[in-house]
Amino acid sequence: LAKSIQASKSSDSTASGTHETSQAQTQVLQWEGVLDEKTKRRLVLGEPVNPSPAKQTIGNYVAIDCEMVGVGPRGTGNALARVSIVNWHGHVVLDTFVKPKERVTDYRTWVSGVRPGDLKKAPSFATVQARVADIIKGRVLVGHAIQNDLRALLLSHPRPKIRDTAGFKPLQELSGNKSPGLRTLSKLVLGIEIQKHKQEHSSVEDAQATMAVFRTQKRAWDELLGIAKKEPVSNTGTAITTTSSAATTGSTKKGQLKRRVSLPSMQARPKAAAAWWEEEVQDYNAQAT
């Protein structure tokens, strides 16, 4: 199904990517064989047809992405309009529109995907802010240029609990850019395309892609941070119920999954996400039978 190549990089690290020089291996997925794009994206991003209760728990790692609209006379000001959070497996924890306090002068639909009707009955900023704060509290927060999201939410998060894929040195070196875009990393690391040209962005897809990139890098990231003991990616608890005023990922119709896929060898899979890959492939094959 997929294999990974490792690029050894000398890099600096902090909680979100910087301080102590060390050797890191950047994991890059390389796809082999014939696999339709839809199935490949589902396996990479994490969109199980019938997710198990374990995959629906919030767990210790969550990824966030926000969409903004324009406010002010020329629409140059930014206001939060949508927030999406996914867990380690890519399962949607929260996906909601947000009603801005200021009058929206530019919905930026071409990139945000937000329309006037989406915000009419959306919850208030304060309501969403409190919900997000509750979800991320005590958890490792993954994001891409995550300070933009935290700034939009008027929230802070402990630096040791932040993983910013835009600031991770091995990924910067892989892309040849100090500020690599999520679209670029998804193509380079995951082998899939998001934020396609002239298509609206989806904060759910962006959050899933960010988590997918992080999954492939987690082991190297932990080594750079000097985390000796592996943190569990999930915890015990009841399955969450996603409450959303936004359209999230669609379900796959029964009978669509026909081709079985084989599990890559341990050497071929990203070590940081080996268990995750095994579960996803098993779920895929179960649906195919």
Set out the residue ranges of the language-model regions:
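Short acidic, Gly/Ser-rich segments with clustered Asp/Glu that frequently serve as metal-coordination loops
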Residues: Y61-R74
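Short His-Asn-centered micro-motif
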Residues: I64, A122, G143-I146
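Metal-dependent phosphoesterase signature
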Residues: S112-A122
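N-terminal accessory regions of nucleic-acid-interacting proteins
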Residues: L1-G59, P232-T289
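Metal-dependent phosphoesterase core characteristic of DEDDh/y 3'-5' exonuclease domains
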Residues: T76-L80, N87-S112, A133-P264, R269-K271, ...
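Short, basic and Ser/Thr-rich N-terminal targeting/leader segments
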Residues: T57, V62-I64, A79
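A short, well-structured juxtamembrane/interface segment
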Residues: V44-S52, K120-V132
